[in-house]
């Protein structure tokens, strides 16, 4: 979940002559998965900087807000997330990340495993609280 402003900029400058390296912490992989092969090549090979509006159009960011509101918007979004069940969010994140590298069938199997485990835990918690009441 990425929030930026129109004046935000994004760049992977490693191909520039003064650097002459590649991103060393997964930048090529993650960027390609987020914005696609063609746009990733454009950014990576050229070292081109893109602004917030382009990042939004390319799917690199989800939301564009005025520059002075980026921090407040991010905090507000985090507060909304914090009200939800952290274990649910953690397992949803696991499923989403798993889906990136696996076919639909395997993704569904993984989701069903996590779902079943969560139900077992919920039932155990409920049974435990009934016994102690």
Regions found by a protein language model. Give the residues of each.
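Residue-identity detector for threonine
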Residues: 7, 28, 32, 54, ...
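CoA-thioester-processing core
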Residues: 1-43, 58, 73, 77
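Aromatic-glycine-rich donor-binding/catalytic loop that engages nucleotide-sugar donors
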Residues: 58-60, 100
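C-terminal alpha-helix plus adjacent terminal tail
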Residues: 47-53, 68-133
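Well-ordered beta-strand positions
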Residues: 1, 42, 46-48, 54, ...
């Amino acid at each position: 979940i990425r929030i930026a402003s129109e004046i935000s900029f994004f760049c992977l400058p490693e191909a520039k002559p003064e650097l002459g390296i590649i991103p060393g912490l997964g930048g090529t992989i993650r960027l390609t998965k987020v914005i696609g092969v063609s746009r990733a090549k454009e950014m990576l090979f050229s070292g081109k900087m893109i602004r917030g509006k382009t990042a939004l159009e390319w799917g690199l960011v989800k939301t564009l807000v005025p520059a002075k509101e980026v921090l407040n918007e991010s905090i507000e979004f985090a507060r909304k997330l914090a009200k939800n069940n952290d274990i649910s969010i953690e397992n949803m994140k696991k499923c989403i990340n798993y889906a990136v590298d696996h076919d639909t069938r395997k993704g569904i199997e993984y989701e069903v495993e996590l779902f079943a485990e969560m139900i077992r835990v919920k039932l155990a918690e409920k049974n435990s609280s009934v016994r102690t009441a």
